[in-house]
Design a protein with these regions (language model features):
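Hydrophobic adenine-recognition pocket in adenosine-nucleotide-binding enzymes
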Residues: 5, 103-105, 138
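Conserved acyl-donor/pantetheine-binding loop and adjacent beta-alpha core of acyl/acetyltransferases
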Residues: 77-98
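Conserved beta-strand in the GNAT
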Residues: 62, 68-76, 99, 104
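A short beta-loop-alpha structural element at the N-terminal edge
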Residues: 1-27
């Protein structure tokens, strides 16, 4: 079952976010240390993310199996209006975009369609809100995630290059 996150889901969401952060650290060669070191740090980060999500007309949905939260997705809406950003105006039309910030499914539940269900729910929300596209960022070394996103219709659009100094 996919539903909107409730305050009762916080501990499970915090634990999943902490696992996700450790995974990112393993893949991201530009990070010298974990962004946060404990579940308390994850809790702080998730509270900020939830507050930001609310202020940006976003949502957090969870996937639940047998009364256990096994995955979540977070997304926000970004509206680009003509004249707000001169550089953006040079290369884009005014638009309303859905942005996926986080998507996580517990390892034991991957490959069972939960990620697709979560994305489908967020896509439905973005569509109702009038978004014309959905965007997300994925680490270039995260082959599984890239394959997943391509399989459901995402295409590679921009490539961000980073150099440590």
């Amino acid at each position: 079952m996919i539903r909107e996150m409730t305050p009762e889901d916080r501990n499970e969401i915090d634990e999943m976010q902490f696992e996700l952060q450790k995974f990112f650290f393993e893949l991201d060669q530009t990070r010298e240390s974990l962004s946060y070191q404990s579940i308390d740090d994850a809790h702080y980060y998730m509270q900020k993310m939830i507050d930001d999500t609310k202020s940006m007309d976003g949502k957090v949905f969870v996937a639940e199996k047998n009364n256990v939260v096994v995955g979540f997705i977070q997304g926000v809406i970004i509206e680009h209006k003509k004249g707000e950003d001169k550089i953006y105006d040079l290369s884009h039309n005014p638009s309303k975009e859905g942005w996926i910030g986080l998507l996580y499914v517990k390892p034991d539940y991957r490959g069972s369609g939960i990620g697709q269900e979560l994305l489908g729910k967020m896509k439905d929300y973005f569509t109702v809100q009038g978004c014309t596209s959905i965007k997300l960022l994925v680490l270039s070394d995260n082959a599984n995630a890239i394959g997943f996103y391509k399989k459901i219709g995402f295409i590679a659009h921009n490539l961000e290059m980073v150099m440590k100094v």
